[in-house]
From Swiss-Prot:
Membrane-spanning segments: 22-42, 64-84
GO biological process: photosynthesis
Protein name per Swiss-Prot or TrEMBL: Photosystem I assembly protein Ycf4
Similarity annotation: Belongs to the Ycf4 family.
Keyword Transmembrane helix tagged: yes
Main location group: plastid
Cell compartment(s), UniProt: Plastid, Chloroplast thylakoid membrane
Pfam family, one: Ycf4
Domain of life: Eukaryota
Keywords in alphabetical order: Chloroplast, Membrane, Photosynthesis, Plastid, Thylakoid, Transmembrane, Transmembrane helix
Length: 184
């Protein structure tokens, strides 16, 4: 859902609030609770949940390990749920020809640097660079090549674009900014 006019282009960026992250967070927390309950059940010597039998698990060392993994999983699940709640990584890329400025805005973790905003001049953009790595885990990323600076990624590293979609996106942006496209 991009917005584009003659002078302005805005590309929204999805953050961590995705269906796959929701599924992983839910599975992680359920598994961690299960591990914790089995570990505590082995300590108490009776089953806290009838479905999860702990009769054959000795508290030392298996029960302690189960508790440790359960607690670690709960902390990881809490972290994942927080990133989903805060939608870390979401934002937008704004290209404003009238002002001659590019704004890259992203939401970060709460605190002093929650809002991440990078600005630079359109005249400093040399090209749009496409990085394509095929194989077991393909990687397709668009970058802005800027004079005297490091390349700035425009898409998420794990964004699942087909080669055609990526080429179209790069061509539209290069046409809008009137710069060339470089492949890698």
């Amino acid at each position: 859902m991009n917005y584009q006019s003659e002078w302005l282009r805005i590309d929204p960026i999805k953050g961590s609030r995705r269906f796959s992250n929701l599924c992983w967070a839910f599975i992680l927390v359920l598994g961690a609770i299960g591990f914790s309950l089995v570990g505590f059940s082995s300590y108490l010597g009776r089953d806290l949940i009838p479905i999860l039998s702990s009769q054959q698990i000795i508290f030392l060392p298996q029960g302690i390990v189960m508790c440790f993994y359960g607690i670690a999983g709960i902390f990881l699940g809490f972290y994942l749920w927080c990133t989903i709640l805060w939608n870390v990584g979401s934002g937008y890329n704004q290209f404003n020809k009238r002002e001659g400025i590019v704004y890259l805005f992203r939401w970060g973790f709460p605190g002093e640097n929650r809002r991440i905003c990078i600005r630079f001049m359109i005249k400093d953009i040399q090209a749009i660079r496409m990085e394509i790595q095929e194989g077991f885990s393909p990687r397709r990323v668009l970058y802005l090549r800027i004079k005297g600076q490091q390349d700035v990624p425009l898409t998420r590293l794990d964004e699942e674009l087909t080669l055609r979609e990526m080429e179209e996106k790069a061509a539209e942006l290069a046409r809008f900014l009137r710069v060339s496209i470089e492949g890698f």
